[in-house]
């Protein structure tokens, strides 16, 4: 399971260090793709295969299903961590997520998300105010 928030830099070649806490679970190869809310999603190869199976079940007759699958899969790339724990984020994904020099990497259960630091900060501030309301509407924690 992925959890936590980490600040990292991107170099001029689009390389970013993967948080040490995430490296073992992600392994040397994993998939990154366009996410929602202008971030990138990162999945283990096992989780990626499970998502692919679910999405293959979507009806091709639905235009929105076709659109989503095209965007999600066309942006996907299998990345490889080097010996320093860095990955190279392709230009098309950097542009999609607005990544430049500073990134925030967060763990979200079965995936990681890679955000431009400013976009994450703005999203966090906006969502922090709604956190309790969202929780009340979506989740019965049964504590």
Swiss-Prot record:
UniProt keyword list: Cytoplasm, DNA-binding, Repeat, Transcription, Transcription regulation
Keyword Nucleotide-binding carried by entry: no
This protein's GO CC annotations: cytoplasm; nucleoid
Domain SpoVT-AbrB per the UniProt entry, residue ranges: 5-47, 76-119
InterPro entries the UniProt entry points to: MraZ, MraZ_C, MraZ_dom, MraZ_N, MraZ_sf, SpoVT-AbrB_dom, SpoVT-AbrB_sf
Localization of this protein: Cytoplasm, Nucleoid
Listed GO MF terms: DNA-binding transcription factor activity; transcription cis-regulatory region binding
Family label: Belongs to the MraZ family.
Summary of subunit composition and partner proteins: Forms oligomers.
Name this polypeptide is given: Transcriptional regulator MraZ
Gene name tied to this protein: mraZ
């Amino acid at each position: 399971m992925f959890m936590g928030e980490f600040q990292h830099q991107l170099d001029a070649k689009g390389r970013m260090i993967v948080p040490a806490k995430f490296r073992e679970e992600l392994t040397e190869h994993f998939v990154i793709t366009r996410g929602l809310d202008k971030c990138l999603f990162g999945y283990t190869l096992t989780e990626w295969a499970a998502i692919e199976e679910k999405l293959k079940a979507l009806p091709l007759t639905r235009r929105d299903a076709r659109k989503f699958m095209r965007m999600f899969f066309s942006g996907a790339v299998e990345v490889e961590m080097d010996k320093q724990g860095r990955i190279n984020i392709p230009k098309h994904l950097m542009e999609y997520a607005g990544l430049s020099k500073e990134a925030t990497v967060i763990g979200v259960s079965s995936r990681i998300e890679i955000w431009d630091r400013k976009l994450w900060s703005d999203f966090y501030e906006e969502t922090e105010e709604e956190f309790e309301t969202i929780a009340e509407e979506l989740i019965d924690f049964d504590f």
